[in-house]
């Protein structure tokens, strides 16, 4: 069994449902999307029509999928990596890791980037707070 993420591809899906689950043991958030897709010719004997599929997805991507009374056409980047199901079994599974387009409109790279600068902007704040606490520590010493 390959225990490392491998190169995936691009998947275009009509998303019909999103769902999340939080593990009570670890607190980890699991997310999935359910979609409808045409069955490729010859894929399953003489099967024709559409199939319902479910994919694991990075939980942070769910906020960008907004339903407006109908399924949403989304394009995702995916990788194959080991995932653990609710029964503890580990299997290599296709996981959707990046949202490339919603409703046929490409996602702007800057729309996904703000989370990182905000985290960096928050890093100096704790450094500034101890300085303020030092001043508070000095003032009680000065009174005593």
Curated annotation (Swiss-Prot):
Organism superkingdom: Viruses
GO molecular function: DNA binding
Keyword tags: DNA replication, DNA-binding
Chain intervals with Low complexity compositional bias: 108-133
Bias (Basic and acidic residues) ranges: 134-144
Ranges where the record places region Disordered: 106-144
GO biological processes: DNA replication
Family: Belongs to the inovirus G5P protein family.
Annotated function: Binds to DNA in a highly cooperative manner without pronounced sequence specificity. During synthesis of the single-stranded (progeny) viral DNA, prevents the conversion into the double-stranded replicative form. G5P is displaced by the capsid protein G8P during phage assembly on the inner bacterial membrane.
Assembly notes: Homodimer.
Protein name: DNA-Binding protein G5P
Organism: Pseudomonas phage Pf1 (Bacteriophage Pf1)
Lineage: Viruses, Monodnaviria, Loebvirae, Hofneiviricota, Faserviricetes
Gene name of the encoded protein: V
């Amino acid at each position: 069994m390959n225990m490392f993420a491998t190169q995936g591809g691009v998947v275009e899906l009509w998303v019909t449902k999103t769902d999340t689950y939080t593990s009570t043991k670890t607190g980890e958030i699991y997310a999935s999307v359910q979609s409808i897709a045409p069955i490729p010719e010859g894929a399953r004997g003489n099967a024709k029509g559409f199939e319902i599929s479910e994919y694991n997805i990075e939980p942070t991507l769910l906020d960008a999928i907004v339903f407006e009374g109908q399924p949403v056409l989304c394009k995702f980047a995916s990788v194959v990596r080991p995932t653990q199901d609710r029964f503890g079994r580990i299997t290599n599974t296709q996981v959707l890791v990046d949202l490339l387009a919603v409703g046929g409109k490409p996602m702007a790279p800057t729309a996904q980037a703000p989370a990182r600068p905000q985290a960096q902007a928050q890093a100096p704040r704790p450094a500034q707070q101890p300085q303020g606490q030092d001043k508070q520590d000095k003032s009680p010493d000065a009174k005593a």
